[in-house]
């Protein structure tokens, strides 16, 4: 290798390393964001998604089910209502406490554990089903998170996911936030989990089948302004985004978000009904 070639190779290596995001730092920021606000206020409205996912998986009593990045426990509770043996995990302790309180109110027996989706503290092939609703899709290291879901699921078991799609309301909210606070260079969008192509990359070689179905969740609020008020108060990533911006940019972000939900609003009165597309996924492990 000539000196010139060595210099070029070194420059390319440096460019690649410079472009690679610091995933540990991203995760730390994410954990702080999800720990702020009170996601459970919003998460509880999404309960129907967990119920529908458990039906799509055709869960049976006695099956061992792991909920990854469970938030306040929507899918966890849905599985427990079907008499499954459920372990509910998240890396935000406060959200686990909300899930624990909900389970206690219903008299449901679940195991709640703090855990990182990219390093699950369970042995290989422990669970009959592994689920995540709008959770694992936010893991910074997507390949590692997918590998962990596969690792803890038994052969012939199922992985059930609900992931916001890029073109749905929440996917477009992500894009709007990204205009004001660009993500780390090289970081893959969480909304890619809502595409068949990315799921095939993440799970294809280890899957007997990947079944996907586009579905919609309707966000129902008093008005677009009410929607934004709730999300900026309780949805950690949005709360943090507004806090990080100077006043003029906050006004611009607010205007853009109101315009977005106003455009998508299907309500014929003064209220807000915005359908947000997500991808329901059922993967059978090889």
Where are these regions (language model features)?
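Class I SAM-dependent methyltransferase SAM/SAH-binding core
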Residues: 64-119, 129, 144
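Conserved class I S-adenosyl-L-methionine
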Residues: 13-63, 74, 98, 158-182, 228, ...
